[in-house]
Design a protein with these regions (language model features):
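N-terminal hydrophobic targeting signals that begin at the initiator methionine
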Residues: 1-2
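Intrinsically disordered, low-complexity terminal tails/loops enriched in metal-binding residues
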Residues: 5-6, 10, 20-168
Length: 168
């Protein structure tokens, strides 16, 4: 009798974990912008990745305690002009763009609206380490917050700890 109860409990916990992961992948956790209250837009969202469902669950219960640990990172993993590793960054409409050197950064800053087309977005989450455990993230375990526009998304990115408590 005890083993059946344990198996049942294990199955139930497995299903609940799947629901958490699927709900996180399905879309943002909010339907109103945290800053303006307007309807959210798909293109103005940010995702935080986690190493496991356990850390994701802890974050969901108390996001304010962990969001400060999320380090903003460039949305690209290689310089859009040279293809080299990133060493310098510039801000563009609330996003951080990575460049191999200040020369490429300067070229981008002179013509950002044209050169942004060369940026290949590699990062789906704003972090590459779990904000709770510090381990590498599992891209399937994310917490997505959406915004009505890139302006609000940029404000959130500058001070996420201030705004994350507004997520319902």
């Amino acid at each position: 009798m005890k083993s059946k109860a344990i198996k049942w409990l294990g199955t139930l916990l497995g299903c609940l974990s799947l629901v958490v992961v699927v709900s996180a992948i399905a879309g943002p956790v909010n339907d109103k912008c945290l800053l303006s209250g307007n309807a959210v837009k798909k293109e103005a969202t940010y995702s935080v990745g986690f190493c496991c469902g356990n850390c994701q669950g802890k974050f969901t219960k108390n996001p304010s305690a962990s969001i400060a640990k999320v380090k903003a990172a460039p949305i690209n993993d290689k310089c859009p002009l040279s293809g080299n590793a990133i060493k310098a960054t510039a801000s563009y409409k609330g996003d951080l763009i990575g460049f191999c050197c200040n020369n490429c950064k300067g070229k981008f800053e002179k013509d950002p609206d044209n050169l942004i087309k060369k940026v290949k977005v590699a990062r789906k989450t704003v972090n590459d380490k779990c904000p709770l455990s510090g381990r590498a993230i599992d891209p399937k375990k994310t917490y997505t917050v959406a915004f009505c526009c890139n302006n609000c998304a940029g404000k959130f990115k500058k001070d996420p700890a201030k705004h994350i408590a507004k997520v319902k």
